[in-house]
């Protein structure tokens, strides 16, 4: 391929492919990468979390983690973009501003996410996937899901404090959509203060919607859109709160966010 006539390339190949493409990486074309190959800052994390040795880590710094709502200015200046993972997108967007404002505790964040079976990609045939998930719910990646690496990485950057979440994923018998329940403890602020922080931060963000307090979104609301919808539910104690976020894993969690970036 003659890359000199191309401005942008969207890499939609599976993980462990782009980092081997020295010809593309050393060209002048800008890459929007939907794989994991350039999401992580630590070379060892690729081997520890994904089981492969990175072949072109020297260009890793040319990739900006592409969470548009928080990295807009950096994206404008970078050469390449590493598109965030689908689960990570649904989790990071509701949490980043709250951690910036020191509004929540970061040492006990628990996340339970549910995804449609399309999140498995094309490693299995559609009929086989439907058969596997029909009348079934399956939990996987408890404490060791691969997206934990980028979630911890991006949350730890906010206040330069190591942050580690406890995360589990579930596959549901629906084709698409992600719903993440994020359980947090507030940090000497009220639950209404949490709501106000999110409302102020996302008021002008086209693709982010915050529902009224105690209204909970469902995945059906966002299927086929690039939207992320957030709901807050007050807990049994004043410092307990559940954040519910929903996205379409194939749009905001993948292709739509790539175009947005």
What label would you give each PLM region?
Residues 1-135, 140-142, 233-237:
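N-terminal Rossmann-like NAD(P) cofactor-binding subdomain of oxidoreductases
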Residues 1-3, 12-13, 107-113, 117-244:
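C-terminal substrate-binding/catalytic lobe of Rossmann-fold NAD(P)-dependent oxidoreductases
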Residues 89, 188-190, 249:
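A generic structural signal for alpha-helix starts
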Residues 89-92, 123, 181, 252, ...:
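Short, electropositive, low-hydrophobicity segments enriched in small/polar residues
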Residues 92-99, 148-152, 199, 231, ...:
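Predominant activation on well-ordered alpha-helical scaffold segments within soluble catalytic domains
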Residues 236-240, 244-261:
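An anion-binding loop in the catalytic cleft
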């Amino acid at each position: 391929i003659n890359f000199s006539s191309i401005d942008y390339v969207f890499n939609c190949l599976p993980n462990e492919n782009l980092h081997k493409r020295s010809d593309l990486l050393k060209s002048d074309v800008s890459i929007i990468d939907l794989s994991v190959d350039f999401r992580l800052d630590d070379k060892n994390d690729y081997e520890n979390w994904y089981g492969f040795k990175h072949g072109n880590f020297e260009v890793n710094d040319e990739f900006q983690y592409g969470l548009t709502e928080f990295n807009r200015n950096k994206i404008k200046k970078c050469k390449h973009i590493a598109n965030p993972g689908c689960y990570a997108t649904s989790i990071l967007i509701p949490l980043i501003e709250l951690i910036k404002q020191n509004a929540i505790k970061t040492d006990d964040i628990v996340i339970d996410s549910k995804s449609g079976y399309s999140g498995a990609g094309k490693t299995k045939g559609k009929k086989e996937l439907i058969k596997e998930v029909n009348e079934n719910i399956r939990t996987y990646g408890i404490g060791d899901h691969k997206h934990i690496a980028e979630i911890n990485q991006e949350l730890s950057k906010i206040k330069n404090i190591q942050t580690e979440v406890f995360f589990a994923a579930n596959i549901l018998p629906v084709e698409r959509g992600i719903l993440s329940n994020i359980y947090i403890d507030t940090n000497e602020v009220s639950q209404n203060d949490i709501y106000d922080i999110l409302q102020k931060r996302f008021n002008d963000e086209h693709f982010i919607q915050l529902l009224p307090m105690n209204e909970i979104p469902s995945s059906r609301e966002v299927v086929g859109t690039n939207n992320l919808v957030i709901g807050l539910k007050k807990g049994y104690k004043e410092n307990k709160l559940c954040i519910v976020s929903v996205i379409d894993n194939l749009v905001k969690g993948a292709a739509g966010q790539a175009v947005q970036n």
